[in-house]
Amino acid sequence: MKHFRPRLSRRAFWVLCALLVCLRLALTGFQQAYIWVGGAPLDDELMFRAANHITAGQWLGAYDYLTLSKAMFFPVWLALLHVLHLPYLISGAALWCGAALLAAFAFSTLWRKKDPAQGRVLTLGLFAALAFLPSSWAAYTLRVYRDNIFPALCLYFFAGMAGMALRAVFTPERPLWPWLAAAGAGLACGYLDREDAGLFLLPFAAAATVIVAVVLAGKRRWKALAAQVIPYVMLGVGVLTFCTLNYTHYGVFALSDFSEGSFAAAMGAMMRVDTDNTAPYLSVPADAREKIYDAVPELEPLAYWLEEDAQLQNDFRDPNLDDYRAGSFYWAIRRAAQFEGIYADAKTADAYWQTVADKINAACDAGTLPNRTGRRVATSQPISAAYVPSTLAETWNGFWHVLGLRDCAPYETLRSIGTEDDFAAWSGYLHSGFNSAANAGEDTPYYSPYQKTVFAVMQGWTRVCSILLTVGVLCAVLCQLAELLPQRRQKCTAQTVVPWLLLFGIFGIALLRCAMIAFVEVSSFGIGTSTMYLATVHPLLVLYAFAGLLLYGRPRKTDKRRENA
């Protein structure tokens, strides 16, 4: 009896793709955005403010301590949607569907030997698995914040690099530049969307480029080899564009005056100063600050705000630790500097923080201030052996958090906060509604019976996906490792090695992202495992499980022949 093998014509494939996209967008249509006006000045409100300034032709607006504090591609995205009159949530879902479809086509080369009609079924299946991935509609996507689009931008990058690598090996007659351009767009936009993007996108890009370059050089495909610079050129153009705009408007040739430059140097210098405090999460504890105030007169005016001002301490100080967590201290000291007029303009702020950095470093080098590290230019905590156990434990927790698709509810349990004028302004600009209505007699958001029904279906799908993803990833790991066994090892050619390395790289970069977020969590934040920060990992594990099981999860014909013999 022949096995049932589903097949799809080209027309049926595209019709089903269109239907799946419509269904995915329809699900998002039941969702409502969430804001807390006055409660997120460093995040959602900063992005919304910048987007409005871009729309008004003022770039990021008047300079203050927040203007250049974060990567600012997301406000550009919001301004673009506003100009095109596109709804915010629907547009984010459409961007995700585009990334999912690109990723499905990128990996379709792996089933090139199948009948085309059968191959389309696999491509459609991978697209559906990614398009309806529950992390893509989780509550964090309902915020007006950069993580609404960051996972999609990263998926464009990974899909482009994977599509390029596989076609370089299996279909040398096809051009690589479209895939490299897609990877470059994802790399540039992702890098400009979050400051930490380069830490896990660039290692993957570098490894993929080197491996493919070896293959192309061996085949003397010099034009394809030269095209490998496309993603890096696009990244350079994007960075140069933003830096030029910042220099034109503020006199600072940088993407950010927070994560780079003199402020990062000042924070790195402050974290050099030794402390007797052993409490977790503290980068510059109170006893270290007292030593710094005495050694650096320029910081004395900020001492009042940091140590005495009730409002600033209420906003940033941790009452349980009675001090500033690392993830809050740098915002607190920047706001204190704002109150003292240091952020009157970018050049004044740059000169001030450079003076602070130079004096602290000089005092540490001279032994006037006790120090625990060498010179650093960073806003993150210094990596030390003390963080290794907790980071590994949190990496493990984060990995299982992703596999279990935890915290992927498609609605926000908190009600949006703001005045009627606030909601009118935000809704008018974003063309999206907010969950501002409350249940009778409660301060919880009201959702209609239709919304609740749809949300229940989406959560049911999440439970199914969590099981499939967990089993799929674990089986894919075992099957890929089994390929290293002598009895299954194939002849080492580009067609066997490159796919294996690609999947190994995807899984490895997923673990790297978990470890990155784990370190920040245990050293600075202490907010618990976050789906928002791990949302780039979910699609990578879907790709790994799907492609890994397809490549290595079935017995080969040669294996069957050996058994029969």
Residue spans of the language-model regions?
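Start-transfer (signal-anchor) and selected internal transmembrane alpha helices
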Residues: 1-29, 122-123, 226-227, 489-503, ...
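Transmembrane-helix motifs of polytopic, lipid-linked glycan transferases
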Residues: 87-117, 156-160
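Membrane-interface alpha helices of multi-pass inner-membrane proteins
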Residues: 179-194, 235-242
